[in-house]
Amino acid sequence: MDESVIFTTEQNALSTSLYSAEQAVLRQCSTNSRNSAVRVGDKYLFVAQSNKALINVYNISGAHKRETVEQRLPTPEVITCLEVIQNRYEEKSAISDFELPHLLLGSTDGGKIYCWELNSGALLSVKQMAHYQGITKIKSFMDGKYFITSGKDSRVIVWQTIDFVSNNASEPKPICILHDHNLTVNDIAVSMTHGANMSTSGAKLFTASEDSTVRCYDFSFLRGDFRKNRKSQEQDQKMYQPRLLATFTFPAAIEAMSLDPADRALYVGTSEGLFSLPLYYTVKGTSTVANLAQASGSNRNKLYSVVISGHDDDYKKLFSMGQLVCDKLISTPVTKLELTFDATTILVGNKFGRISVVEIASKQILKTLQPLTTADTEEDAITNIIVTTVNNSRQDSILEQHQSNKNVQKLPVLQRVVHDKDHAEHEVWYRAPETPEFSHELESLPPIADFEKYMDSIRSEETVFLTTETTSQVKNVKQELAPASHSNSQEQQELQQELQQVKSAYKELRELHESLFKEHEQLLSSMK
C-alpha cells in the first residue's frame, strides 16, 4: 500500500509517491487556478488549463502512466474549477480501475457552472450567473446527491445534483445561500460523519475566507424535500438556512483548509502559516473538554479568537474570554492543504512551489516535494494537491491482464451545446465491467441464489424451535471422564504407598541418627 501524490503549480505538474523516490513530470500542464485538477477514477487525471478553453487528460494508472497528454478535451470557455461526482451505485467489478464516474462539473471565472455526462460527453445543463464573480471551489458530498460552490463574491451556495440532470425545463435553483463572509471564500469542507438524509444527517460545513474567519454550519436544520417546496422556500428563507454554530477568527487571511476525517481537528492555512485547531478543545489545567462544533441551546453563534500558544498562557482565563490557544505547525505562507490517508501527516503547499510533508504530532517536516525543473519557481505557487491510496499489487495484476489491448478507447468529446433531453438521442459509450471471482461465490449462497427458498427454510426452522422442547446438549464431563479418573485413582494409591515407604525409611534413619548422636555426646563427656 502506497500513497500517490499529484500536485500542480502555475507552470508545472508532478506525479510522485509519498514513501518512495518515484517521480514523473506531467508535460504541457499549466494551471494558475486552485481546485482545477481532479482525478477521474483510478486511471485519468483532468487538469483545466489556464487561459485556454481546454482540459488536459493524463493517464496515471500504474505501468501505463504517461508523462505526455493522453487526450485534450475542448470546453466552451476557460474552466477554473473541476469536480467529479462518482457513480456510487455501480457494483464493484474486476476492472473497476477503468470505469468512469457519472458527472463532471466545471466552473468559470464568470460564475457559470457546466455539468457534463462523462460516458457520453453530453452537456446536460449550464447554470448562468451561479455566482456574481468567479467560483473558487466545487465540493460534492453525500455520495454526490448535493454539491457546494464557493466564490469570490463571498457567497457559499448549496445545490442539488438532480436539478442539473433532470428533464425539468426550469434552470437549477440553489437549496440555500450563505452570505456571512465579507471577502472571497477560498475553501470549504464537509464532515464525513453524517447520515443519509440532509435534514437529519448532522453534517457540518466549514467555510474559510480571506476575511480571516472560519465558519461552521449545521445542515440538520434543512428540510429533506427541496424541490416540492420551492415557493414556501422563497417565502420563508430562514427556515432553510443551515444554522451557524461557531465562528473562528484567525490572525491572517485564510488561503486553505483541511478537515480531519474523524472531525477531530481543523487545519487552517493562512498567509502567516499553518494552524491546528482541535474541535474537541481541552482547557489545560482543568478537566474541561469543549466540543467547538456542537450546537448550543441558546441558538447563538459562538465566537472564538485563535491565538498562538505560549509558555505562560492561562488557558482557563483565555477560554472564558473566547480565545483558543492553538499550535502553529509551520510558518510558511500556505496556498493548499491535503491530509494523508491516516491523517497523521499533512501536505502543505506554499507560494514558492514546494510541498512540505509535516508530521502533525511532532511538527517536523519529514519530506519536501518540488517540481523537477531548472526554471525559476520562486513565485510559482502550488495550486492543486491530490493524495490517493494505491494498492500496487492489485493494480499491477489488473494492468497485466489488459496489457495486450493496444486499442484504447478515447473519452467522449465534451459537447458545447446543451443536450436536448426530450427529443435528441442519448447514446452512452460504456465498458461493461467484468464480474469479479468472489461475486460467483456469493451468488451460490442461499440468500442470493434463491431468497424465497431460504425464507421457507428459516420459517420451518423457527416452527421446529417453537414447538419442540429444549434439550440440553451439554456434555456430562464427569461421566465421560469416569474411566480415566478410575485409572488415575489406582496410580494415586500406588504413589501413596511408595510415599509411605519412603517416610518410614526416613523415620528409621532419623532415629538411628539421633541415637548415634547421643552416644557421641556421652563419649565426649566421659573424655573430659
Curated annotation (Swiss-Prot):
Keyword set includes rRNA processing: yes
Molecular function in Gene Ontology: chromatin binding
The UniProt record lists the keyword Magnesium: no
InterPro entries hit by this protein: WD40/YVTN_repeat-like_dom_sf, WD40_repeat_dom_sf, WD40_rpt, WDR18/Ipi3/RID3
Keywords: Nucleus, Repeat, Ribosome biogenesis, rRNA processing, WD repeat
GO cellular component, one term: rixosome complex
Segment forming the signal sequence: none
GO terms classed as biological process: pre-replicative complex assembly involved in nuclear cell cycle DNA replication; regulation of DNA-templated DNA replication initiation; ribosomal large subunit assembly; rRNA processing
Localization of this protein: Nucleus
WD repeat residue numbers: 79-126, 130-169, 188-227, 249-290
Role according to the record: Component of the RIX1 complex required for processing of ITS2 sequences from 35S pre-rRNA.
Subunit organization: Component of the RIX1 complex, composed of IPI1, RIX1/IPI2 and IPI3 in a 1:2:2 stoichiometry. The complex interacts (via RIX1) with MDN1 (via its hexameric AAA ATPase ring) and the pre-60S ribosome particles.
Family label: Belongs to the WD repeat IPI3/WDR18 family.
Name the record gives this protein: Pre-rRNA-processing protein IPI3
Biological source species: Candida glabrata (strain ATCC 2001 / BCRC 20586 / JCM 3761 / NBRC 0622 / NRRL Y-65 / CBS 138)
Gene name of this polypeptide: IPI3
